[in-house]
């Protein structure tokens, strides 16, 4: 991102609160509210930019927003991995706090598999529209207006009520077994399982779905897609970095660490 920015090849949208943006941001970044991101990008000539970078605090809200932008056809949209936490240590508080408490559930993961539910029906959408494009636009607008809050859940809330959620482990099958998973979680293979022709319809339409990955960034992007379709899906914040951090480090899985913080200048 730094290199692209120095050569004017990237358009940066920072969706953090205005007060935090004022305290420090990447040079050339535009501060835009999440609910306004689609309206904003529609008014920008992106011809000369190779990428659009969406920036938040941790990479999670940006993952959610980027997923919706891509569903709307903006294939140049990318989320800044780890958010501003990766840019400079000044902005890394959220991630540092998450991993500081990141071993809270290290003794509670299990290897026992839970089978997927039997395939059922897709959610019913009521937008008042009939064409695919109109329905898509209405759903994306609704999700952006609602913001990221309804689309996220803490690991503490999930562990406090395991039976309240259909828990999706969005990992490769081998890792579902080792290092294991949240009790009752069901393995869905990234980029494959949630396709309509594969296992999408095994997801429930009458129960909240808690999706977790390593960091909360991929799950946020997936949850945007699932919520668009009408599922009550929620991304588990900080993923397993906030649950079994040391175990992940030991197995060389994706973790936030000091080496991820670049120490770049900001304005």
PLM regions with names:
Residues 11-16, 29-32, 165-169, 185-188:
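Short hydrophobic beta-strand that contains or immediately precedes a catalytic carboxylate
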Residues 17, 172-175:
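Single-residue recognition of alpha-helix capping/boundary positions
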Residues 55, 212:
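Short, surface-exposed ligand- or partner-binding patches at beta-edge/loop junctions that are enriched
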Residues 22-51, 63-151, 174-208, 217-267:
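Rhodanese-like catalytic fold shared by cysteine-dependent sulfurtransferases
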Residues 1-26, 31:
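An N-terminus-focused feature that recognizes amino-terminal "leader" regions
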Residues 1-4, 144-160:
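A short, well-structured juxtamembrane/interface segment
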Residues 3-7, 45-48, 158-164, 202-205:
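Flexible, charged surface loops at secondary-structure boundaries
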Residues 59:
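Aromatic/histidine-rich interaction motifs
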